[in-house]
Design a protein with these regions (language model features):
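Ligand-binding cleft/hinge of the Venus flytrap
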Residues: 14-26
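Short beta-strand->loop
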Residues: 1-9, 30-36
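Hinge/cleft segment of the Venus flytrap/periplasmic-binding protein
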Residues: 2-8, 20-23, 115, 119-178
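Hydrophobic alpha-helical segments within soluble ligand-binding/sensing domains
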Residues: 12-15, 41-43, 96-100, 116-132
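Hydrophobic alpha-helical
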Residues: 17, 31, 35-102
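Short beta-strand elements at the ligand-binding edges of bilobed clamshell
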Residues: 1, 32, 106-117
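Conserved beta-strand scaffold positions in the cores of enzyme catalytic domains, especially
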Residues: 29-32, 91, 112, 146
Length: 178
C-alpha cells in the first residue's frame, strides 16, 4: 500500500520495495495502490486487494503506520489473521509511531521502520554553526531504527550495509520521545 503518490517518502519507499521484489525471484507483487498515508484509505485499498487476492497474500507492505492500521482492520474484518505465525498475513510498516510500535509489540505489525521526526534541534544546530562561520559536514544522517515483534530477523542488508533490527519491548516504547 503506497503512500501519497509523488511524496518523497512514497517515492523512496516504493523504489526500495520494487528493488527488493526485483532481487527475489520468489516474490510477486499482487497489487500496488495508494493508501494516501491515511488509515481510512489504507483500509479501503486493503479491502479491495483482499477481494482480488485474499488467500494469496503473504505480506502487506504499508508505507506508513496509518495505512498499516487500516490494512490490519481490513484483514481482520475479512477473517484473516495478522502476525508472524504460519498462515497469517505479515504487515510491514514505516514511521514507528507509538501506536505502530504497540501493534509491533502485540505482533500485528511484523516490522516497523523508523522515520524519526526529531530533526528540528539537529537542523537548528547546523544552521547556528553555519551562521557562526563554522564548517559543517556536507551530509547529516539521521539515526533511525527498525523494530520487530521478535528476534526472527536480527538485521537487514540494504545495498552493502547491514542494519540492526531491534526486538520491541514496552520499555522501549515508554522511553521514546514520540
Amino acid at each position: 500500500i503506497q503512500g501519497t503518490i509523488g511524496a518523497s517518502a512514497q517515492i523512496g519507499r516504493t523504489q526500495g520495495f520494487d528493488d527488493a521484489v526485483e532481487a527475489h525471484d520468489n516474490w510477486t507483487t499482487l497489487a500496488q495502490q495508494s493508501g494516501e498515508f491515511t488509515q481510512a484509505k489504507g483500509q479501503e485499498v486493503m479491502e479491495s486487494i483482499l477481494k482480488q487476492s485474499g488467500d494469496d497474500i503473504d505480506v502487506v507492505y504499508c508505507e506508513n503506520d496509518n495505512e498499516a492500521f487500516g490494512a490490519i482492520d481490513a484483514i481482520e474484518a475479512a477473517g484473516y489473521e495478522v502476525g508472524g505465525e504460519e498462515g497469517q498475513i505479515l504487515v510491514m510498516s514505516f514511521d514507528t509511531t507509538n501506536a505502530g510500535l504497540t501493534d509491533t509489540l502485540s505482533g500485528k505489525i511484523t516490522l516497523d521502520t523508523e522515520c524519526n521526526p526529531l530533526h528540528g534541534p539537529r537542523v537548528q544546530e547546523i544552521i547556528e554553526k553555519l551562521e557562526a562561520g563554522e564548517e559543517v559536514d556536507k551530509q547529516a544522517y539521521v539515526d533511525e531504527e527498525m523494530f520487530a515483534a521478535d528476534d526472527t530477523v536480527t538485521s537487514i542488508k540494504v545495498d552493502d550495509a547491514d542494519y540492526e533490527v531491534t526486538t520491541i519491548t514496552q520499555d522501549i516504547i515508554d522511553g521514546r520521545a514520540y
